[in-house]
Amino acid sequence: MSGEKEDPIKLHKQGNTLCDTGQYEEAAEKFLQSSELYEKKGNFFDASNMLFKAGECSFMLKDYKTAIERFNKSAEIAFKKGFDRFGVSALEYALDCYKALGKEKDKEVVELQKKIKNVKKKLASQLF
């Protein structure tokens, strides 16, 4: 692996630039590479964030199934490390993908909605 590919911050920035110019496939690749490196370094928030950004790229490309996978993985990492608000955001985007696929009545969607509701309830109870 070259030095460039080993630097998650550089890959992250390259992904942002590619995304800003509408090069979503290329951006998603940079974000995925960055996510792996962040995770290896123990930076789980940025690992989750990069998966989220890769999910956004897939969403922009209308590849909703891939976007769902990426948003779910992002949420999984976020919840595991206590970043519950971020995890909820990822799940809400996954929900948008299911809606775009016309699957808002599917069992997975109902379960996802329950999970989002429960996490939001938990977060609200922590405010006081």
Regions found by a protein language model. Give the residues of each.
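Residue signature of alpha-solenoid helical repeat architecture, marking inter-repeat boundaries
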Residues: 3-6, 25, 45, 65, ...
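Alpha-helical segment of the N-proximal tetratricopeptide repeat
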Residues: 4-40
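Eukaryotic all-alpha helical interaction scaffolds
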Residues: 18-19, 35-38, 58, 78, ...
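Single-residue signature of alpha-solenoid repeat helices
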Residues: 27, 47, 67, 87, ...
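Flexible helix-coil transition and linker loops at the boundaries of alpha-helical arrays
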Residues: 38-44, 79-84
